[in-house]
Structures are given as structure tokens and as C-alpha cells.
Design a protein with these regions (language model features):
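Phosphate/NTP-binding elements of NTP-utilizing enzymes
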Residues: 1-215
Length: 215
């Protein structure tokens, strides 16, 4: 499927990771407005359109939060890029299907039984996106990690989250230990070319009072 998406559609800091298929773990973290979640969706849409097999499981700690966050963001980028004719979005059970047979399913870790019965019309699970990964327990991450298996296609987990405590399992696992299968990218609002000046000024105001939003 040949679709042309201009490089200007992406923030430059993320472009080197658009086609990464060598790492198992892609870690995207940063403060508010950094564009990490938008890039995750842009990247997944690119993979859905260009790879012969790409089936994505999008996960949050609570299933109900997907509708107004991850699922809505997928729909927004599909519309913005003019791809509505190539994707079918099923609001009732939060499923997105690409014209080539690839698809996306949205689930939550608050119902692990439903995670056990996930199937895709075309092939196997190839990608997992864990949004707000700091809200997920390490045990739940491990369960997702071991599910992503199989020969023939590269498997990858993308984790997006804001800066975390020095004691959080994400820091211990991906920052304190150096896993050669993981690539880590920190971004800030300064890397996001699509923010308006008023919002940038708002974030600047948190520099001294709340580094969580600023960093």
C-alpha cells in the first residue's frame, strides 16, 4: 500500500525512530506536550499501512480510559492525514481495521481475562503500545511481554509515560539497567513544533513550581 506522508508531519526528534525494527522495547518518555503519544500513533499508522503484517494491542491500566485517549487519538490522526477511506473504526468495541487487513485492538489491564482471548483477523499480535506505562504494574508488563512471541515478524513494545520516581520499576528496568534490546528517547515540549506559543508559555510557568509538567 503506497501512501505518502511528508516528513514535516512528524516532529524531527522522533523521525529516526519511525522505522525502527531492531529493538524490542521503544521507550518514549517526557513531560506534558512533548508529542510522545502523538508520535506513537503516527508511527503505528505508518506500520499498519506499510508492513505486510502488523497487529497492534493498545493497553492502558483501565480499559475505559482508552476511548477518550488512545482510541480518540488514532481517529484524530487518521482524519488529519486524510486516511479515513483506508481505516474502519468500530466504536462499539474499540477496534480499528486497515484496508490491507492489519488491525488495532484496545484493552485494559483491569480485565485480564479479556486479554487472554485477543485474536486478529489477519495473523498474530506483532506490536503492543502501553500508554501511561507508569500506571501499570511490572507484573502486568511481564505478562504482556511474554505474550509477544512468534517467528517471522519482529515484535515490539512501545511504552509512553511522563517522568517517574527514582523508585519506579520503569526506571529500575529500563534506565538503571542497560538492555541492548531497548532504545530510550526523552522529549520535552520544546521538541514539539506543533504547539502554539500560549501553551508553551503555560508550560514554562511550571518550570519552578511543578517540574513534572515542565520536564
Amino acid at each position: 500500500m503506497r501512501i505518502t506522508i511528508p516528513k514535516s508531519a512528524f516532529n524531527p526528534v522522533f523521525v529516526p525512530y519511525l522505522t525502527d525494527s531492531t529493538h524490542r522495547y521503544l521507550i518514549l518518555y517526557g513531560g506534558a506536550g512533548s508529542g510522545k503519544s502523538v508520535f506513537a500513533v503516527q508511527r503505528f499508522l505508518y506500520r499498519l499501512l506499510t508492513l505486510p503484517l502488523c497487529n497492534i494491542l493498545v493497553v492502558r491500566a483501565v480499559a475505559a480510559t482508552n476511548r477518550d485517549s488512545t482510541y480518540a487519538l488514532f481517529r484524530q490522526v487518521i482524519f488529519r492525514w486524510g486516511l479515513s477511506e483506508l481505516f474502519s473504526c468500530k466504536d462499539s468495541d474499540l477496534r480499528i481495521s486497515c484496508a490491507n487487513g492489519n488491525s488495532v485492538i484496545f484493552k485494559g489491564l483491569d480485565d485480564t481475562e479479556k486479554l487472554k482471548s485477543i485474536t486478529f483477523p489477519k495473523g498474530e499480535l506483532t506490536d503492543i503500545w502501553i500508554e501511561e506505562a507508569s500506571e501499570v504494574q511490572e507484573e502486568d508488563f511481564n505478562q504482556l511481554d511474554v505474550r509477544l512471541r512468534g517467528k517471522g515478524t519482529h515484535k515490539q513494545i512501545v511504552l509512553t509515560f511522563n517522568p517517574v520516581s527514582v523508585l519506579h520499576w520503569l526506571k529500575l528496568r529500563f534506565f538503571d539497567r542497560k538492555d541492548p534490546r531497548a532504545v530510550v528517547l526523552k522529549s520535552t515540549y520544546k521538541d514539539n513544533n506543533f504547539l502554539d506559543e500560549d501553551y508553551k508559555a503555560t508550560l514554562e510557568g511550571y518550570k519552578e513550581t511543578d517540574p513534572y509538567y515542565y520536564s
